[in-house]
């Protein structure tokens, strides 16, 4: 193998890392489960809901891989927040500001690791309204990642309070089974 191929490969990796800096990767990490939940909501329900389970599993695994990539490109020598996205919201009073630091990346990895395990183990625990359960799980994943990434107090509060709704539904409907 010629060393020039190794150089090309590493320059390709550096190109990916350089081009990802302008991409809103944290917003993608937050919105991907919501898009999956909307897709499951608008699909026709089959008799066994297996297609919904596979879609939810695919979305959650894609989110886990995205968080692994985020952990890979995370610079552990920087103490400050990284991948910060700041959008003005509500006439400058409230900003949609998200970013990650060393602790929040670990919580994001934990969240995106546990959700596919929950979706895989859903056959043994959930017997009714599986489609609604999967939508609630994906929405709760969105809200938890939003809580761990938020840098604005109002955005944190909105993600935290919105995360209580699917959690309440999961505990209330499927908690006694």
Feature map (PLM): residue ranges:
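Alpha-helical multi-pass transmembrane bundles of energy-transducing inner-membrane proteins
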Residues: 47-49, 139, 143-177
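Cysteine-centered motifs
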Residues: 2-4
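Alpha-helical transmembrane segments and their immediate interhelical/interface regions
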Residues: 21-42, 150-167
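Residue-level recognition of transmembrane alpha-helices
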Residues: 30-33, 56-59, 111, 137, ...
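Hydrophobic, membrane-inserted alpha-helices
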Residues: 35-37, 115, 139-144
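Transmembrane helix-loop-helix hairpins at membrane boundaries of multipass inner-membrane proteins
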Residues: 17-25, 39-135
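Juxtamembrane/membrane-water interface recognition
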Residues: 11-14, 41, 174
């Amino acid at each position: 193998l010629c060393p020039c191929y190794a150089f090309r490969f590493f320059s390709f990796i550096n190109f990916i890392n350089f081009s990802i800096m302008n991409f809103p990767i944290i917003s993608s990490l937050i919105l991907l489960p919501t898009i999956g939940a909307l897709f499951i909501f608008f699909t026709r329900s089959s008799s066994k809901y297996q297609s919904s389970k596979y879609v939810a599993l695919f979305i959650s695994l894609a989110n886990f891989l995205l968080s692994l990539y985020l952990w890979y490109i995370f610079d552990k020598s920087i103490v400050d927040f990284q991948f910060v996205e700041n959008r003005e919201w509500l006439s400058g009073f409230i900003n949609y500001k998200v970013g990650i630091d060393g602790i929040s990346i670990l919580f994001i990895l934990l969240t995106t690791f546990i959700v596919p395990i929950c979706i895989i183990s859903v056959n043994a625990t959930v017997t009714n309204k599986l489609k609604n359960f999967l939508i609630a799980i994906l929405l709760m994943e969105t809200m938890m990642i939003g809580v761990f990434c938020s840098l604005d107090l109002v955005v944190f509060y909105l993600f935290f309070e919105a995360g209580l709704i699917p959690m309440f539904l999961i505990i209330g409907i499927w908690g006694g089974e």
